[in-house]
Amino acid sequence: MLYNLLLPHIHNSHIANLFHYITFRSGLAIIITLSLSFVTGPILIKFLRSLQKYGQPIRSDGPESHQTKAGTPTMGGIMIILSSCISTLLLADLTNKYIWITLFGFISFGIIGFMDDYAKVKRNNHYGVRGKSKFLLQGIISVIIYVLLEYLDKNSSHVLNVPFFKNLSLDLSYFYMVFAIFVIVGSSNAVNLTDGLDGLATVPIAFTAGSFALISYLVGNLIYANYLQLTYIPNTGELTVLCSGLVGSCIGFLWFNAQPAEVFMGDTGSLSLGGVLGIISVITKHEIVLAIIGGLFVIETTSVILQVYYFKATKGKRIFKMAPLHHHFEKHGWAESKVVIRFWIISVIFSLIGLSSLKLR
């Protein structure tokens, strides 16, 4: 909004001219989301406590140390969604189609997560919305997003770019729709599965969002895209502002979510954040790079799939002490803080590997 209001005055004012630069607006987005999180955090947490008598239900079969978390309010993802959306509406170019499509997906996945959190709190158990119902809703939203992208961009590509290999790509043709939906829904649920310890998912999400802030900027810049031999996609640079807002809001949320957490992001936060990252990866044509940068989310999800499959195949045996993987290490005797910090380190490594694919070909 500020960008659109100041646009006519760019050549007449030094301050207005600053808003012409995506990098300036992205930096400002981080500052605004951080500030909003610090200011609204205590108010929101107090409000959630007043509404939630028992807080987020704690699984009885989980690590014993988790029983001390009883009473901690959930739905803290509202803080992340609000601060990110406000900064984006203030600083991004509101005539940009990708901004509106991404915000639509972000909020829609957040609503699904809110419904799930609300069901858990109301029933006082960890069973929220049925899994099939959640997948169906996520699928419908993903289809709408894909159709919007196809309709608004007549030259949209169905090519899947393979990182680290020069000029290697796969034309998925009509199958690309299925692939894009899989990426968005899969990303949403992968982040959701990772969000099981205080601060565990928050930092990797920030790293991933920061990485895609850079990717969006490069892909949307003709000079940089040509130099790095990336697929140039006009107008995606504005997503840098949105991604930067996600980084700031996640860091701000971590202030309240660090161990011992004062609030959990809940499915409201994890489903929306995972979904928006999936959407951005589809828009920028860096779907495989998302799987690399978000490697921690992939590992956590894979551990659950393997555990369930092996349990059914062997009629009761388990590969891990508990899934997702972070609970396995807790059951193995690792302190929660050690699991979280080591997983953060792994996330940094994956982010560096993913970003290196932009140059190494």
Curated annotation (Swiss-Prot):
Transmembrane segments: 28-48, 74-94, 99-119, 133-153, 168-188, 203-223, 236-256, 263-283, 288-308, 338-358
Protein origin, superkingdom: Bacteria
Catalytic activity line of the entry: UDP-N-acetyl-alpha-D-muramoyl-L-alanyl-gamma-D-glutamyl-meso-2,6-diaminopimeloyl-D-alanyl-D-alanine + di-trans,octa-cis-undecaprenyl phosphate = di-trans,octa-cis-undecaprenyl diphospho-N-acetyl-alpha-D-muramoyl-L-alanyl-D-glutamyl-meso-2,6-diaminopimeloyl-D-alanyl-D-alanine + UMP
Record bears the keyword Ligase: no
Bilayer topology: Multi-pass membrane protein
Gene Ontology BP terms: cell division; cell wall organization; peptidoglycan biosynthetic process; regulation of cell shape
Molecular function GO terms recorded: metal ion binding; phospho-N-acetylmuramoyl-pentapeptide-transferase activity; UDP-N-acetylmuramoyl-L-alanyl-D-glutamyl-meso-2,6-diaminopimelyl-D-alanyl-D-alanine:undecaprenyl-phosphate transferase activity
Protein name according to UniProt: Phospho-N-acetylmuramoyl-pentapeptide-transferase
Organism: Rickettsia typhi (strain ATCC VR-144 / Wilmington)
GN (gene name): mraY
